[in-house]
Swiss-Prot record:
SUPFAM superfamilies referenced in this protein's UniProt entry, alphabetically: Glutathione synthetase ATP-binding domain-like, N5-CAIR mutase (phosphoribosylaminoimidazole carboxylase, PurE), PreATP-grasp domain, Rudiment single hybrid motif
Record: residues binding ATP: 138-193
Family statement drawn from the similarity comment of this UniProt entry: In the C-terminal section; belongs to the AIR carboxylase family. Class I subfamily.
UniProt organism field: Candida albicans (strain SC5314 / ATCC MYA-2876) (Yeast)
Entries under Pfam families matching the protein: AIRC (PF00731), ATP-grasp (PF02222), PurK_C (PF17769), RS_preATP-grasp-like (PF22660)
Protein name as it appears in the record: Phosphoribosylaminoimidazole carboxylase
GO molecular function: ATP binding; metal ion binding; phosphoribosylaminoimidazole carboxylase activity
Gene: ADE2
InterPro entries for the chain: Ade2_fungi/plant (IPR016301), ATP-grasp (IPR011761), ATP-grasp_carboxylate-amine (IPR003135), ATP_grasp_subdomain_1 (IPR013815), PreATP-grasp_dom_sf (IPR016185), PurE_ClassI (IPR033747), PurE_dom (IPR000031), PurK (IPR005875)
Effect upon mutating residue 219 to W: In strain: ATCC 32354 / B311
Amino acid sequence: MDSKTVGILGGGQLGRMIVEAAHRLNIKTVILDAAKSPAKQINALDDHVDGSFTNYDSIVKLAEKADVLTVEIEHVDVDALIKVQEKFPKVEIYPLPETIRLIQDKYLQKNHLIKHDVAVTESVAVETNTVDDLLHIGEKFGYPYMLKSRTLAYDGRGNFVVKDKSYCEKALEFLKDRPLYAEKWCPFTKELAVMVVRSLEGEVFAYPTVETIHENNICHLVYAPARIPDTLAKKASILAKNAVKSFLGCGIFGVEMFLLENNELLINEIAPRPHNSGHYTIDACVTSQFEAHVRAVTGLPMPKGFTEFSTSITNAIMLNVLGDKATPNKELEICRRALETPHASVYLYGKTTRPERKMGHINVVTSSMQDAESRLSYILGDTTEIPKSLATDKESPLVGIIMGSDSDLPVMAVGARILKQFGVPFELTIVSAHRTPHRMSEYAIEAPKRGLKCIIAGAGGAAHLPGMVAAMTPLPVIGVPVKGSTLDGVDSLHSIVQMPRGIPVATVAINNSTNAALLAIRILGAYDSKWLTEMNQYMLNMETEVLGKAETLEEIGYEDYLTDKLKK
């Protein structure tokens, strides 16, 4: 695909997955790291360099073999990179050494972002690493506050919570002689992340906003998309893109942020490389974060939409596989359960097991977060058997049929049969707007998260159910007026059809759940073309049926036709 050879400083799991992406594009890669590192295990070339990515001579050897240098870890020797750039002016280095230096020092990183009007957590440099220094910071920020190493820190290593004055000495003992800075305590409600890829021209593309769950300061789970309102997800995406725009050079960047209780977003830190929070992209997105990085540093095309989810209904959970604390290789039991689970993919890194070491990850990709969570539950061993719905790979419902009373069931069952005829997964239940208002509210709000794409709501009399549900969900709602005992359903029809502006409800004829189901299938066609194909076939069948009747009528005459019809 490209004649450039990419030299990678670092041969860990991130380098390994960069190599995999580059191989698919016929791009040669050479690795600088220890012999038999994870990236070298899957690239059997003799050109690799055994050595340290912080050693000038080793970096020179790598530069002699490459057209482009990039990093899988930011803890490289930037001064050495700059010297190499001077020695080999034709060798491109991405991200630029200046960018790597800025991001390496987390305090400089924050000051850089502040200068570019990017919201970050409040912080201050620690000048002399003394107890008095930390006490003064405590007076400024209050307790607790976070003391952090400015450099060589990741996965919580280099962080210490200063809970009160008595912890100041302990903090200095723990962090020793590192350069330090302090952050004001940030009472976040969620941790979010956005992968952003930057082209050499400065154009940025954001992957979906995700939610990260940490245990012992190590990323444990990633939910994609994040379990937050779409407006907040978009806000996070804009913040991440603005942050990455402020740096020079190209490549993929991992942007971590905090979501506060007041819905304010603050950047926590940025990594100038592929990131753990982006591993889900391998299976869930059009292009993985690793391929995006390769494209960026080699100047390959990055078309609009290449960082989006593969489908509009994609939901994914990434699980980190860590070395077991007690029993070596016990973590492989999780991997085995994942291999038994439909829609789960296992990625192992070729590492020797150590407690809490990142040994691999598992991606679970389905059409709803509820489905993904069910599969994850089995993988983690929370359930001992694969749920029947997973064993049979039963599809999650796409359409919800609800009614105010079981007396509406004879009407709504007709629509259910239509959905069943088409093979559309659906659910059917009773939700009363007046008798179970809390249940109705919960059903409407949670419906999108459960993977529903459309709701059919049948109601008679006052018929408030369709409108109330439509007011609480962004999904399309189809109202079915049910014929009552007094006004023949006209009251229900008028109630459903007369919705105020801004709260649309598609309303079908009285008792006509058939059309409601058919309309729901057409709506599904906007998500998946197979439903358009099914609907087109249904319409052709109707045409064939009517043409057949017309032919018979014309052949035998209306009197015999009517006699035969009455007999039936």
